[in-house]
Amino acid sequence: DFINFVKELSELNNQNDSNIDKLKKAKMKNDATVEDNLVALIAKIGEKITIRRVKFFDKSKGANFSYVHSAVEKGIGKIISVVKLDGVSKNNEQVGNKIAMHVAATSPLAIDKEGINKNLIDKELEIIKEEIKNSGKPAEMVDKISKGKIEKFLNDNSLLNQTWIMDPKKKVSDILKENSSADKEIKVLNFVKYKVG
């Protein structure tokens, strides 16, 4: 029942532009709304289920690649990641699936450093500076050390700057370059990772 609900929900999401409110009000095949079907499903299986987030990747400009970890059925699992790439051709499609797997394993916050939320960076910098001060380092060293640590935070959390999980000597950006052709550069347009729970 749950798997069938999820499959139909996914189809409806594609028709509702990832608008969670529209999705909850949408009619399912049995003519009841998603919300009503969700209540009935919760009553039937006795598990708390919520629809917290949705995302839709259209098929215009670029190609979508996915990875499902701990799959219970095709396209359904405990962790799923989807990556939208531009510049991928038939002979280098495997790179899309590998990058989707990388996203599932590493949980980047953004494609590049500039995409990471400024408030999050400020908060992280505050924590880093406090840790350095509490470690007994001289006050004049705090800024210098914190710059290096915040740079590491940005690299670790921006997809293009992350260390490639399949070869720690490379970054994700290196993998994209290696798989690009002379006339087609592979670019990450978007990505998402969802985990059950």
Report the location of each language-model feature.
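N-terminal assembly/interaction segments in proteins that build large macromolecular machines
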Residues: 1-197
